[in-house]
Amino acid sequence: MEKGDLIAACSLFDQSIATETDPNALFQAALCYRKSGRLNDALSLLKRLEDQGQTNPPALLLRADIFCAVDRHHHALPLYQALSGIDNPQIQYSAALGLFQCGDIDAALKLASALAERATHPINDQAALLKGRCLAAAQRYDEARQTLGKIDATPALQKAATYRIARMDLHTGQFSAAEASLRNLLDLDEPPRGARETLLQSLVHSGQTDAALNMIREATDASADLSWLRHCTELLSELDQPDPLQLLASRWDKAPGPEIFRELCNRLLEANDLTRAESLLKDYAKTFGQDAHWQWAHMRKLEKERAYEEILQCKQVDPFGSMEVVCHAHFALGRYAEALEAAQQLCRSAPGDQYFIALLVTALRCLDDPRQAALTDSALFLTEAEPQVPALEAGGATDFWRSVEDAIAHHHSMTSAPPTQSVVDGIQTPGNLLTQTAAPPLIALKALLDEVAHRFFDGTLFKDLAEPHPLRLFRPNSVSMHASWAIQAKAGTYHHSHVHSKGWYSGTCYVEVPESLNDSAEAGHLVLGEPPFETKDPLPPLATLCPKVGKIVLFPSYCWHSTRPYSGQGGRQVVAFDYGKANRFV
């Protein structure tokens, strides 16, 4: 493991770990599994340590970090909170960082601020950096800039602070400032990790698509990590460039490995290119064998081929890695009790995961289980509003929505749908629309959405929910809009059914609607409750809603939602958004 050969190290641990009792050996094996991405194996070993009474801070921290990495924030937070009380600045800093990553910004800010004020301690400047990030997440941007601007203890920390300020500039729409800072950082010998893709994002979000494409063409393979390749692939797809998967395929040819395999195979399967996916599976098996990564891709390909019985016959190397596909297969075969069991296992593995909650809801509906009502009652959880709009224009509401439409037009720079999103044959604005704008109509729109949303969130519904209800259990301490984007549609555009995995509550606001859409037919309607996968007995929608200019719709992020295509003249422009934990982009 010290030499970096994690595959060999894991293989050695696999041969002996079942009978190992030494706490240090178990901890080292857990570390190795964690670094190799075998998170469930790492957690199993840490559970063995806990059962032995070995709950020392490093083991607790590793367990919390793994929970955080798989979005099991509900399990990670109590561990980070316990670690924050240990009188050890390094452990406390790690706990503060974990609290931040789990979205408890207030607790992270309090702890980071206390650590930053410890003069002469080596951790104080790192804590000040985290404090600045917490302030930015709390939308206290001036304080964040002031805090980050004072950090100069070492060149590395100063670069890190400059990088975070640049990300804050990008997040708040100060594109020129972000670009200038990032270019300066990239001229240094060792720029901060992520600076290059952040510059690419800055170019894309500011509409400089030609410059972004040139940046991709001029990049060298040596500096291309997977994060960079993902950003490039998305942009190449949305700008209709030839062979948008070329960079991922080239990386696989030159440096094959599990991570690039999963990324490329996932893209091929999403594009329904099963021939290339099968070829990739064969190549991977020759080098790495039919391991858990191969099995995940193989089972996903079987799902695309509707080979559901064959899926259930597969030997599962990593149960949780493929459980989602198994769950889908049970639905398709009408084995709803088994689908419910699989969904429950997934929810236990990642409490709060909106997709897994949606699987659970779907199973309850297929079984006609009365427990579904607590999760699907549209009369309670769905809200529609048509609020009075701000008087920005003399023409009233009509001119307000037209001004919003015109402001959004300046943010549209793509020519095709994002390949990993739900929209088909439409385009989507890049970035976070309502934080990256200085346009008065969009600022007014955000204020309007916040007013409608928080009036609903502060109502009696959420106070009366049972404690285990996901809308109560996973409600953030402080709810804020953390993502927003606009989608421009035309005749034929529609959305695949999906959930918003990073939200708590989601919504849409209709800015432009074709005159042909009405209640007499479902064309162009928003559809709630239809799953995106096959069920032996088709489920009816929970609700279908006709778009109308100025209408705002809110629904739980775990609710499947899609749109029907429409025909005829006229476009449809919507602003979609998620409420949940604070945005931690900075």
What is each model feature region?
Residues L6, L39, H73, I105, ...:
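TPR-repeat structural position
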Residues Q436-D450, H454-L554, C559-V586:
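Catalytic core of non-heme Fe(II) oxygenases with the double-stranded beta-helix
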Residues A29, R63, A95, K131, ...:
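Structural register within alpha-helical repeat arrays
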